[in-house]
């Protein structure tokens, strides 16, 4: 079994863990390969570009926060990802630093389970060619630097849902419901629910609220504005600048993400400890 290792090189603790992990693998003659930037920063090898790492490994290890895990999962495709939290929140990264070796040993023994998470797929045309972008958390179309309030036109399966005058629109998966969508007033949704949530960003309308829809729907979004360019971000990464009236479609991706599960944690505990959900000032839920 070979492991692909992706490290948040901006965090010294993540680099320290990576060195420790490489030594641990070497002592046990276990195969591993770093993502190129991680390997060059550490001065360790072998390494390969992130786009090629999937061809050389069976399991991925993410050493960083949720952003590192999102980046890793996009390139892992369906291969298992062990998320070690060396970040601030660590909502998606299942394991603490002290649990790293136990998690790896579980995978080596085959005695592990997976959390399979659905993704969305955004389709846009660039130079006349269709491009697909996957996201585990969300796709966000926003006004960017446009100085006025545009209207975001949303259709479901070809039928008009509404026109939102807002700073942007978030289309989130159930996994992504606790990310940007939640910050914009969207609901918390259990991670294996087969739904999308459509959340407007700062809508200039008192009657507009987030809406939850089945993830078997095809969502079409365009921007009604006389001019300007509007950024499309998938999991926080800029994918395209949309012109007025240019349409993107969003649907459930056929590719799911497999996260190695930490069976010591449950979703309610994660909400309470990471988001302080339901906690009163006296700490009665601690």
Curated annotation (Swiss-Prot):
The keyword Transmembrane helix does not apply. It is an enzyme of class 2 (transferase). It catalyses: NAD(+) + ATP = ADP + NADP(+) + H(+). Its EC number is 2.7.1.23. The keyword NAD applies. NAD(+) binds at residues 66-67, 137-138, 148, 165, 167, 178-183. It is found in: Cytoplasm. Pfam families: NAD_kinase, NAD_kinase_C. Its cofactor is a divalent metal cation. It comes from the Bacteria. This is NAD kinase. The active site is at 66 (proton acceptor). Involved in the regulation of the intracellular balance of NAD and NADP, and is a key enzyme in the biosynthesis of NADP. Catalyzes specifically the phosphorylation on 2'-hydroxyl of the adenosine moiety of NAD to yield NADP. One of its GO terms (cellular component) is cytoplasm. Gene3D superfamilies: Probable inorganic polyphosphate/atp-NAD kinase, domain 1 (3.40.50.10330), Probable inorganic polyphosphate/atp-NAD kinase, domain 2 (2.60.200.30). Belongs to the NAD kinase family. Keywords: ATP-binding, Cytoplasm, Kinase, NAD, NADP, Nucleotide-binding, Transferase. GO terms for biological process: NAD metabolic process; NADP biosynthetic process. GO terms for molecular function: ATP binding; metal ion binding; NAD binding; NAD+ kinase activity. InterPro entries: ATP-NAD_kinase_N, ATP-NAD_kinase_PpnK-typ_C, NAD/diacylglycerol_kinase_sf, NADK.
